Amino acid sequence: STGYGTAILVFGIYFIIQSKNKPAEALLMAAYAVSAEIMLRMTGGTFVNEYGKYLVMLFLFLGMLFTGFSRNALVYWLFLFFLVPSVVLSTVTLDITTDVKKAIVFNISGPVCLGISAIYCYKRELTFQRLLGIITAFSLPLLCLVTYLYFYAPNIQDVVTGTQSNFETSGGFGPNQVATILGLG
C-alpha cells in the first residue's frame, strides 16, 4: 500500500512534467489522488495525514508552473492571503496541551487546497473528452475500493446491531469517509 502511495506521487510528477500539463494533466492526477486517498488511508499507505490534499496541491502547483493561471483570480489569492490571520488567531485560542503545528496544519490544509484548486481551475477550459478522462481517473481507485470492501467486510448480519454506522462494514475505516467517496463515484 505504501508502494501504491509512492507510485501515485512519482508517476503523477513524471506525468505532469512529461506532458508539460497539456491538456490539464494536473487536474487528472489530482482527481486520481483524491479518489485514492481513502483506499490509501484504509490500508496504511499514506505517509502523512491528509496525503491526498498535499498531492492535489503539489500536482496543481506543478500544473500552474507549466501552463500558468489566470491573472484575474485575485479573489482566490485574497482568500489565501486572508488565511494568514486565521493561523495567527488559532495559535492564540489553542490550549497548552495541543500540538500547535499539527492543529494548524490539519485545519488549514483544506482551505489552502481549495484556494490552490480554485486558482488553477479559474477560467480554465476543459473539453468534454478531457472531463470524461478526469471522471475516469477519479473512478478507477473507487473500483479498487469497492473490491477491497467486498473481500474485507464481514457478513453484515454478524456485525450490524442497529442503525448506527460502524467500522466493520466499511472495511475497518471511517464509515462517513467511505460512504462519501462511494457516493461521489
Which residues fall in each region the model found?
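Membrane-interface helix termini and inter-helical loops of multi-pass transporters
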Residues: 94-99, 156-167
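Alpha-helical membrane-inserting segments
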Residues: 36-40, 121, 148
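Membrane-interface junctions at the ends of membrane-embedded or membrane-associated helices
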Residues: 67-73, 121-132
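N-terminal hydrophobic segments of proteins, predominantly signal-anchor/transmembrane helices
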Residues: 14-107
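Hydrophobic core segments of transmembrane alpha-helices in multi-pass, intramembrane catalytic enzymes
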Residues: 4-12, 50-60, 102-118, 176-185
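Plant-biased detector of terminal regions, especially N-terminal secretory signal peptides
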Residues: 81-83, 117-122
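Alpha-helical transmembrane segments of multi-pass inner-membrane proteins
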Residues: 113-120, 129-161, 171-185
